């Protein structure tokens, strides 16, 4: 049930499949949840500005049923995204949402 969605203004990200797998493993590790439940998304070429500039930037959404650690996760994911895309951590926003189990569906049911 953990989800990470990375939106970036970059037109493309080299080896995006590898980045998605890295994000998946990192999110499973950070939340302590099985990777079998992790979903990763990468959206490129999103029209975006940050601080009044159209230089490359990213917006990251992380959702989970509990297990969120915003300070540690912000550091880890900014570092990972910066190393793989070249987008400075100072141009990355990370937003977190702790979702109720009854509000998250999968496989025909909700988790709570």
What is the predicted function of each stretch?
Residues 1-112:
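Interaction-mediating elements
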């Amino acid at each position: 049930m953990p989800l990470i969605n990375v939106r970036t203004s970059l037109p493309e990200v080299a080896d995006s499949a590898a980045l998605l797998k890295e994000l998946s493993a990192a999110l499973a590790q950070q939340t302590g949840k099985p990777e079998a439940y992790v979903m990763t998304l990468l959206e490129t070429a999103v029209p975006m500005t940050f601080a009044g500039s159209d230089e490359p930037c990213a917006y990251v959404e992380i959702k989970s049923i509990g297990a969120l650690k915003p300070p540690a996760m912000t550091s880890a994911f900014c570092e990972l995204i910066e190393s793989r895309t070249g987008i400075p951590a100072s141009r990355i926003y990370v937003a977190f949402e702790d979702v109720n189990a009854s509000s998250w569906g999968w496989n025909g049911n909700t988790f709570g």
